[in-house]
Regions:
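Membrane-interface interhelical linkers
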Residues: 1-23, 53-77, 118-124, 142-146, ...
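Specific alpha-helical transmembrane segments that line the substrate/conduction pathway
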Residues: 43-53, 82, 89-120, 157, ...
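Hydrophobic transmembrane alpha-helices of multi-pass small-molecule transport proteins
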Residues: 77-80, 107, 121-140, 157, ...
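Transmembrane alpha-helices of multi-pass small-molecule transport proteins
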Residues: 14, 37-84, 112, 160-164, ...
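Glycine-/small-residue-enriched transmembrane alpha-helix faces in small-molecule transporters
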Residues: 1-43, 77-80, 84-88, 131, ...
Length: 295
């Protein structure tokens, strides 16, 4: 008689974990943005990745695994993509509201999903994504036009996110999350020279260290752990569908913590990109469901 409540709880639990993870990531982004006046986006990215790599090395101890040359190459590319994604996203946050930056960045994984499917319905999702981009990107009008450099940084972060997905799948095929830990180390080494050159001794400012540690936990250690638990309890495509609402979390985080007000047009643009991402994921699930049933 208790089967249905247990089934409902088993469904809601991983969803709750993902919602907490998304809230954690965007809260970390808001806190990171408050550090920019002190050490800049470059220094903030550097400290976040350094602390995150230390945390993940201590917890996962990836040096215990042996990797082939091919896997190690994939880990290095994966780590560079991760570093580029974090760096460019934080550079975008200097002039672009968090919600819009996340939506622009989300075009990376959306493109990977669409181009890997190539079903007729995907043209609808492409059109929705393009419509969202056209609403968000500067169009020469006054008032709420986005900074073009910031928008370019966010789109660049999306490209890095796409590479992160492609090479992350290859790097993680043999050693899973241990590869992710090594990737974070590579990302830290990749970005550190830029952050040190920009911020210098300001990186050691006493007030900055605890904030950077909090950002590393909120944006990396905690959400990674929660997402890993959730992935063991729900299908990967359901996971992808739920993650599609992350731009909305970014917009809400910017509103609550930084007072970033978005226009109705910008909210509609974010909604269009979210809808395109959800639609793509659901279309992929329908396309693969016969094969799953056959197994």
């Amino acid at each position: 008689m208790n089967t249905q409540p247990r089934s409902l709880a088993a469904t809601l639990f991983p969803i709750g974990l993902l919602l907490i993870a998304m809230a954690s990531i965007q809260s970390g982004a808001s806190l990171a943005k408050s550090m920019f006046p002190i050490i800049g986006a470059q220094g903030t990215t550097t400290l976040r990745l350094i602390f995150a790599s230390i945390i993940m090395l201590l917890i996962l101890r990836p040096w215990r695994v042996r990797m082939t040359t091919n896997t190690l190459r994939n880990v290095v590319i994966y780590g560079m993509a991760l570093g580029g994604m974090n760096f460019l996203f934080y550079m975008a946050l200097q002039t672009v509201p968090i919600g819009i930056a996340v939506a622009l960045e989300f075009t990376g994984p959306l493109a990977v999903a669409i181009f890997s499917s190539r079903r007729p319905i995907d043209f609808l999702w492409i059109a929705l994504a393009i419509a969202g981009l056209l609403l968000l990107l500067p169009a020469g009008h006054s008032g709420q036009a986005l900074d073009p450099v910031g928008a370019a940084y966010a789109l660049g972060a999306g490209v890095c996110w796409a590479l992160y997905i492609l090479f992350g799948q290859r790097a993680g095929a043999e050693h899973g999350i241990q590869s992710a830990a090594l990737g974070v180390v590579v990302a830290a080494l990749f970005v550190a020279p830029i952050g040190i050159a920009h911020a210098g001794s300001a990186l050691l400012t006493p007030a900055v260290i605890p904030m950077a540690l909090a950002v590393a936990i909120l944006s990396t250690a905690l959400p990674y752990s929660l997402e890993m638990v959730a992935l063991t309890r729900i299908p990967a495509r359901t996971f992808g569908t739920l993650m599609s609402i992350e731009p909305a979390f970014g917009a809400l985080s910017g509103l609550l913590f930084l007072g970033e007000m978005l226009t109705l047009t910008q909210w509609l643009a974010i909604l269009a990109i979210i809808t395109a991402s959800v639609g793509t994921t659901l279309s992929m699930r329908k396309a693969t469901s016969p094969a799953i049933a056959a197994d």
